[in-house]
Curated annotation (Swiss-Prot):
GO terms for cellular component: cytosol. This is Ribosome-recycling factor. Belongs to the RRF family. CDD domains: RRF. The lineage of its organism: Bacteria, Pseudomonadati, Pseudomonadota, Betaproteobacteria, Burkholderiales.
Amino acid sequence: MSAAEIKTNANQKMEKSLEALKTNLVKVRSGRANPGILEHIHVDYYGNPTPLSQVASLGLADARTINVQPFEKTMVAAIEKAIRDSDLGLNPVSQGTVIRVPMPALTEERRRELTKVVKSEGEDAKIAVRNLRRDANEHLKRLTKDKEISEDDERRATDDIQKMTDKAVIDIDKIIAEKEKEIMTV
């Protein structure tokens, strides 16, 4: 593996870490309704736990209400139960074939708890990025030791990987700041 391949590989993995962070943050509830928070809920569908997004369409009725439209009318009760049993503190209301999920306003205390969760997710993402940097640098050192690349190439590649790491950490900080602002906005 060449130094360029190591840099490309590290960059791709850092991008995946950022995407994973964004995916995890969608699940953290803010004051606004977001259908993404319901996607990880599993519904009992003929004896099989099935993701909610596969048995119903999710949409927004307004800024504080999510509409859940089951594909089968018989699923209304099971979906309602799954949402109620989730640890999100939501209370779905059935209106015939549509389930409305109003998002209760967050208390100040709950907002602070959620910002701590968001910061923790951000720290986990930074740790993942730094581990990727360490792995790439170790790989470069092995190549230098085995005389496959020169020390100058190693130094250049190490500097490039550090720049990628710095950029990824800045991006993580921006994502976290945006989510915290979203949570703290009443």
